[in-house]
Amino acid sequence: MIHFKRSQRKYVKKTYRVLNRHEYEAGLRERGSLTVWISLHDGKLANWDAPRPKKRKPGRQRKYSNHAIETAVTLGMVFGLASRQTEGFICSLFTLLNLNNDVPDHTTISRRKAKLGKVPFYENKQKTPLHILIDSSGLTVHVGQLRKPPKSRHYRKLHLCVDELTGDVVACDLTSKSARDSSRVPSLLKQIDSPISSARADTAYDARGVYEALDNHLAHYSPRVLIPPRKDAQLASTSATTRQRNRNIREQARLGKRKWHTESGYSKRSKVETTFYRYKIILGPAMRARGLASQRVEARIGCKILNTMTELGMPCSEMIG
């Protein structure tokens, strides 16, 4: 007989019902449409060939544009294809469409992917204040064939900043597993040019630098920061950056941890966990590339894919029991 603790009995799995089932299923079908991932204009590929440089540089000139390489990487990630399979898939696609464009081989795709740099994946068109959720998770990487298995698992840390209302990935960063979560918040905020209304993160981000980075993000905006303090957290001297942390410490001590999570709105942070679940289920829990530069490009393209799928349609549900 299994005995549960008293605290474990309070958690009961909720039952939800999808309200927009027909619209959501239509969006799921659109995820497999090639017209979503390949841009065509008048039956021709848009921006596939590299533009001619104004001044000729020494060496061989580029034949394919960055857009062509990004499209090839995107197709491989969406449909779960290896590099050579992606090359064959694009060749057969061009044959069916009667296109005379050349197809980059797998070595060109792998080499050029590391040079794509910061691929844009999010744009706040309305410029409204954001309610952001910050967290990180690990993605395993291939370490090659070793005589002995490694003592610890080798992985990369994917840091995401998610919009609470829309579920879009606002900012992302990829680091080694030794990087601290709190140290990557300034680099995430540099990618956001919109004002921030509130920010939620777990206890790993309970650091002075996180509060300072959020408070100094944009002038005339002071976001509400909801980060549960550590067990040994102490009140600091009152200042502009420590005022919110002291407030979180006092409220959690007065209400209790669980009640503070509910009343303060911190429980909405679980939506960022859903984003990581979507990333690992749709794109896989492991990185395809070997080098860190290519892996960072792959992570940004993965975030762009998730945002595109979010735009196609997401479920709207209500709790029924």
Annotated model-derived regions:
Residues 66-78, 257-321:
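Basic, amphipathic alpha-helical segments enriched in Lys/Arg and hydrophobic/aromatic residues
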Residues 2-16, 203-280, 293:
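Helix-centered, glycine/charged polyanion-binding patches within enzymatic domains
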Residues 97-100, 308:
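Short arginine-rich
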Residues 1-58:
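Basic, low-complexity segments
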